[in-house]
Amino acid sequence: DELDEINMGGPTRTLVFDLSELDNPQLHHVYNGVTRAIDHNGYIKDEFYYLANYTGGLRVINVNEIGNERMGEIGFFDTYPSDDKANFAGAWSVYPFFESGIIAINDINSGLFLVKAKNMEN
Protein backbone atom coordinates (compact mmCIF):
# COMPACT_ATOMS: atom_id res chain seq x y z
CA ASP A 1 0.00 0.00 0.00
CA GLU A 2 3.08 2.24 -0.03
CA LEU A 3 2.87 3.41 -3.65
CA ASP A 4 -0.84 4.20 -3.95
CA GLU A 5 -0.36 7.82 -2.86
CA ILE A 6 2.23 8.32 -5.62
CA ASN A 7 0.53 6.30 -8.37
CA MET A 8 -3.12 7.14 -7.69
CA GLY A 9 -2.98 10.36 -5.68
CA GLY A 10 -5.32 10.94 -2.80
CA PRO A 11 -4.75 10.82 0.93
CA THR A 12 -2.88 8.27 2.99
CA ARG A 13 -4.85 5.03 2.84
CA THR A 14 -4.76 2.14 5.31
CA LEU A 15 -6.50 -1.13 4.45
CA VAL A 16 -7.89 -3.04 7.44
CA PHE A 17 -8.51 -6.76 6.96
CA ASP A 18 -10.51 -9.22 9.04
CA LEU A 19 -8.24 -12.25 9.51
CA SER A 20 -10.54 -14.26 11.75
CA GLU A 21 -10.55 -16.90 8.99
CA LEU A 22 -6.95 -17.08 7.80
CA ASP A 23 -7.93 -18.99 4.66
CA ASN A 24 -10.45 -16.29 3.77
CA PRO A 25 -9.22 -12.77 4.64
CA GLN A 26 -11.84 -10.06 4.16
CA LEU A 27 -11.34 -6.34 3.56
CA HIS A 28 -13.09 -4.83 6.58
CA HIS A 29 -12.47 -1.12 6.30
CA VAL A 30 -10.48 1.51 4.41
CA TYR A 31 -9.14 4.40 6.47
CA ASN A 32 -8.21 7.58 4.62
CA GLY A 33 -5.82 9.86 6.48
CA VAL A 34 -5.65 13.63 6.50
CA THR A 35 -2.47 14.09 4.42
CA ARG A 36 -1.23 13.02 1.00
CA ALA A 37 1.99 11.71 2.56
CA ILE A 38 2.93 8.06 2.07
CA ASP A 39 2.05 5.73 4.94
CA HIS A 40 4.82 3.35 5.96
CA ASN A 41 5.38 1.43 9.19
CA GLY A 42 2.52 1.29 11.67
CA TYR A 43 2.10 -0.33 15.08
CA ILE A 44 -0.89 -0.91 17.35
CA LYS A 45 -0.53 -0.34 21.09
CA ASP A 46 -3.70 -0.49 23.17
CA GLU A 47 -6.37 1.38 21.21
CA PHE A 48 -3.94 3.48 19.19
CA TYR A 49 -2.33 2.98 15.80
CA TYR A 50 1.05 4.73 15.57
CA LEU A 51 1.83 5.35 11.91
CA ALA A 52 5.05 6.56 10.31
CA ASN A 53 3.69 8.75 7.55
CA TYR A 54 6.91 9.85 5.77
CA THR A 55 6.53 13.62 5.11
CA GLY A 56 3.47 13.68 7.39
CA GLY A 57 5.55 12.54 10.39
CA LEU A 58 4.03 10.43 13.17
CA ARG A 59 0.23 10.08 13.06
CA VAL A 60 -1.67 8.68 16.04
CA ILE A 61 -5.02 7.13 15.15
CA ASN A 62 -7.64 5.88 17.61
CA VAL A 63 -8.75 2.38 16.58
CA ASN A 64 -11.00 1.72 19.59
CA GLU A 65 -14.07 1.54 17.29
CA ILE A 66 -12.38 -0.29 14.40
CA GLY A 67 -14.97 -3.07 14.62
CA ASN A 68 -17.57 -0.45 13.71
CA GLU A 69 -15.38 0.81 10.83
CA ARG A 70 -14.43 3.98 12.72
CA MET A 71 -10.88 5.24 13.02
CA GLY A 72 -9.82 8.81 13.71
CA GLU A 73 -6.59 10.73 14.01
CA ILE A 74 -6.12 12.18 17.47
CA GLY A 75 -2.62 13.60 17.17
CA PHE A 76 0.56 13.95 15.15
CA PHE A 77 4.16 15.12 15.29
CA ASP A 78 5.49 16.45 11.99
CA THR A 79 9.20 15.68 11.58
CA TYR A 80 9.19 17.06 8.00
CA PRO A 81 7.24 20.33 8.24
CA SER A 82 8.24 21.71 4.82
CA ASP A 83 5.51 19.71 3.04
CA ASP A 84 3.26 16.64 3.11
CA LYS A 85 3.85 15.54 -0.49
CA ALA A 86 3.87 11.87 -1.47
CA ASN A 87 7.61 11.19 -1.50
CA PHE A 88 10.13 9.17 0.47
CA ALA A 89 11.35 11.74 2.99
CA GLY A 90 10.61 12.19 6.69
CA ALA A 91 9.39 9.59 9.20
CA TRP A 92 10.31 6.04 8.16
CA SER A 93 9.31 4.21 11.33
CA VAL A 94 8.06 4.73 14.88
CA TYR A 95 8.37 2.80 18.15
CA PRO A 96 5.58 3.38 20.71
CA PHE A 97 6.41 0.55 23.14
CA PHE A 98 8.55 2.23 25.82
CA GLU A 99 7.00 1.93 29.31
CA SER A 100 7.71 5.64 29.83
CA GLY A 101 5.25 6.58 27.08
CA ILE A 102 8.01 8.03 24.93
CA ILE A 103 7.56 7.42 21.21
CA ALA A 104 10.67 7.12 19.02
CA ILE A 105 10.41 8.45 15.47
CA ASN A 106 13.10 7.51 12.93
CA ASP A 107 13.32 10.26 10.32
CA ILE A 108 15.29 9.64 7.11
CA ASN A 109 16.38 13.27 6.85
CA SER A 110 16.63 14.51 10.43
CA GLY A 111 17.48 11.48 12.56
CA LEU A 112 15.84 10.41 15.80
CA PHE A 113 12.99 12.23 17.52
CA LEU A 114 11.77 11.26 21.00
CA VAL A 115 8.30 12.57 21.81
CA LYS A 116 5.68 12.00 24.48
CA ALA A 117 1.98 12.76 24.22
CA LYS A 118 0.43 15.06 26.80
CA ASN A 119 -3.02 13.54 26.50
CA MET A 120 -4.11 10.36 24.73
CA GLU A 121 -7.87 10.87 24.87
CA ASN A 122 -10.19 10.73 21.88
Regions found by a protein language model. Name each.
Residues 1-122:
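Feature marking well-ordered beta-strand scaffolds used for ligand recognition
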